[in-house]
Amino acid sequence: MKVLVLNCGSSSVKYQVFDMKNESVLAKGLAERIGLEGSRIVYQRGSEAKKVFEIPLPTHKKAIEEIFKLLVDKNNGVLQSLNEIDAVGHRVVHGGDKFVESVLVNDEVYSIFKGILDLAPLHNPYNLQGVDACSELMPGVPQVLVFDTSFHQTMPEEAYIYALPYEWYEKYKIRRYGFHGTSHYYVSRRVAELIGRPVEELKIISCHLGNGASITAIKNGKSIDTSMGYTPLEGLVMGTRCGDIDPAIPILLMEKENLTPKQMDEILNKKSGILGISGVSSDFRDVGEAAEKGNKRAELALKVFAYRVKKYIGAYYAILGGLDVLVFTAGVGERGPLERSLICSGLEHLGIKLDPEKNKVKGEELRISAPDSKVEVWVIPTNEELMIARETVRVVGEKIIKKVI
């Protein structure tokens, strides 16, 4: 079975084609700057070198159409025809409380999803455009929606209800949803496999630390709490997002600086976080280099970031009633020895102790905890695309039309 995985953003489409017999990647790449000057497609066949094709891409449909042409191209392709694609899996950012698991697209599912586009206005509409494009270009091929939020639908009410007037939850569904669910799901299963224990027996804290960052408490294989909220703005300090702050601060600053809601949203999402504190960059590598050269604000940014993660680890240790495994994943989690060290320093009383040599690892699966650490600490590179492909195979096989609360 061959599966195409698509991740449609506002001006990009990431794609991978899997042969699910051995879960190998036949081709992958990125269409970028859609609707802008200088649009192009990055294409990589198997383990070969990447190729770049400068192509006008006015719409997402055109981008997907050009990707399809490359996949069946005589010189560069990996397919004889598009008929070899058995199913398409779409990464979808927000399923709200309507979708508790991945679903096969039909008219009813399409209509329900179209009704919740406003939950993630910067993401969901483009996910839908990907579905529309595939429906036109490959009619009849099964399509599956895999939601970032689905894994967190097992959270108890006390974890997802905000202390706001309850009618706002009833009327607008304002509640914690959480994100990065596909990543947290993947690494929790993968680490259980590596240590040889059923995930249903484990208490896991999963730290997805990239430019966007979240942390999840996983008990018996299920998410019981997560740091992101109604939007991905809540929780940890991120590359450009502020994470948890006093809710009165935006109101105060809007009055003092005469800012509109849109301007305030822009500041909180794109000008805060590591970038806002350091004044250097949103890239942790750049901030780390600046800190090594003595930049005090860069040092402070990294300390604030690590401190926030550490607080969440302590809180989730409490609600889990202990901890078996701490997992680091995503860009910073996989490739940030400094950040991992800052986070774990001082957590020895919780049974968390790193091996300094093993902690130097970057981008590889490895247990990095010391031999006498009661809690196993692992680096697990995430693989959301593979997880989406697996979910697509499962859903198409089981013909899961919908799971609506």
From Swiss-Prot:
**Which branch of life, at top level?**
Bacteria
Which Pfam families does the record associate with it?
Acetate_kinase
Binding residues annotated for ATP, in chain numbering: 14, 208-212, 283-285
Q: State the Gene Ontology BP annotations.
A: acetate metabolic process; acetyl-CoA biosynthetic process
The positions annotated for binding Mg(2+) are 7, 384
Q: Which CDD domains match?
A: ASKHA_NBD_AcK_PK (cd24010)
Q: Where in the cell is it found?
A: Cytoplasm
Tell me the keywords, alphabetical order.
Answer: ATP-binding, Cytoplasm, Kinase, Magnesium, Metal-binding, Nucleotide-binding, Transferase
- InterPro entries, per the entry: Ac/propionate_kinase, Aliphatic_acid_kin_short-chain, Aliphatic_acid_kinase_CS, ATPase_NBD
A GO term, aspect molecular function: magnesium ion binding
Q: Pathway it belongs to?
A: Metabolic intermediate biosynthesis; acetyl-CoA biosynthesis; acetyl-CoA from acetate: step 1/2
One GO cellular component term? cytoplasm
Q: How is the cofactor bound, as the UniProt entry phrases it?
A: Mg(2+). Can also accept Mn(2+).
Enzymatic class: transferase
Concerning NCBIfam families, the annotation shows:
ackA
Q: Which family does it belong to?
A: Belongs to the acetokinase family.
What quaternary arrangement does the UniProt entry report? Homodimer.
* Descriptive protein name: Acetate kinase
Organism listed in the record: Dictyoglomus turgidum (strain DSM 6724 / Z-1310)
